[in-house]
From Swiss-Prot:
Ni(2+) binds at residues 192, 272, 292. Its EC number is 1.1.1.261. Its cofactor is Ni(2+). Homodimer. Binds 1 nickel ion per subunit. It comes from Halalkalibacterium halodurans (strain ATCC BAA-125 / DSM 18197 / FERM 7344 / JCM 9153 / C-125) (Bacillus halodurans). SUPFAM superfamilies: Dehydroquinate synthase-like. It catalyses: sn-glycerol 1-phosphate + NAD(+) = dihydroxyacetone phosphate + NADH + H(+); sn-glycerol 1-phosphate + NADP(+) = dihydroxyacetone phosphate + NADPH + H(+). This is Glycerol-1-phosphate dehydrogenase [NAD(P)+]. Gene3D superfamilies: 3.40.50.1970, Dehydroquinate synthase-like - alpha domain. The gene is egsA. Belongs to the glycerol-1-phosphate dehydrogenase family. InterPro entries: G1P_dehydrogenase_bac (IPR023003), G1PDH (IPR032837), Glycerol_DH (IPR016205).
Amino acid sequence: MNHLLKQAKRVASECECGHEHQWIEMDELQLGRNAINYLPEYLHEKGLLHVTIVADANTYAVAGQLVAQLLKGRGIDVENCILKEQGALTLLADEHGLGQLVIGAAKETDVFLAVGAGTIHDLTRIASYKFGKPFIAIPTAPSVDGFTSMGAPVIRDGVKITFQTQAPIALFADLDFLTQAPRSMVAAGFGDMLGKSTSLVDWQVSHMLNDEPFCPAVFHMTKSALTMCMEHADEIAACNEQGIRLLTEALIMSGLAMLIFGHSHPASGAEHHLSHYWEMAFLRSGGTQPLHGAKVGYATMLISALYKNEARKKIETFQGEGSPLVNSIHKHRERLLMLIDTIPESSDIQRLLESVGGAVKSADLALADSLEDEALEKAHKLRERCTLLYCLNEHLKTS
């Protein structure tokens, strides 16, 4: 069992913060070269001898085919479900993608193997849950922190909805696959991690002002993952084995923190709300969907600038009173300003994103300036969460 999983299980069982933590059912986590070689033995031990590999054409070529050969050589029955793109659009976690998987899955499957990046895992997570079967995560790119998550973000009728389903029972992160990932997906994973710069502040704000649940141990797990990425940005930018290992470890750590906590608060704040807002706009227009982490990284730049400038000034001069939330903003003014000071400067976030080839301007995402401004004004309404963006738009604008 990997040290990350041991640490997460220890936090889940020993933490005394008062918040009810989720017990982690996952019992195997392998990260390294040839990690996939541990898979056949694991499946035999569990009696899971009929598997369905879920992949797309690219991830099957990179990893799925090798996994299938390995398992067949050890007497395990393998069915392949290769998901296809919808015309000119990339594969999405939507009704079309889910329909392909439901139709293509073998009836006698004991376990699903998600061989791919975020979309493949989201589709496999919700389909396996609906079938009442477990699934195993085999990421092919260090692109998101949701590989270990219970949440499955699915697009339904053009709206992104997160369903709480199930986490994988095991994760095999093989560096032989991960080091082949396109640079854009590495940059996306790094952008997803940089998003914790603002999400951790929003989480503390929501706890302070609105008494939303908080856990110091989960906070420090997520903060450690973020710090590790920022301190090793050069290695990640080089896309060498050590850099990919560190980024993957950070993404897994962040995902386990969310799994323990039972909510996405640690890893998802206003920067993710902007990303979701843009994603739905791209869906409505039929435009090419930028990678999730690319949107999150750029949104983190915007939120940093907004919080450290406009929000700071509004809080410093805030004189409002009335509702419990407004009174709480006034009461915690100094603490709010201290939290804002912990956010990296927008220029520093930009420099880090540039180093890995991430999106640093709206044109990099084919994002209209008007949509950027619109998201800053409206994205806080997508989630019932007391982020600093929510406070700014709903209570501080007129102060």
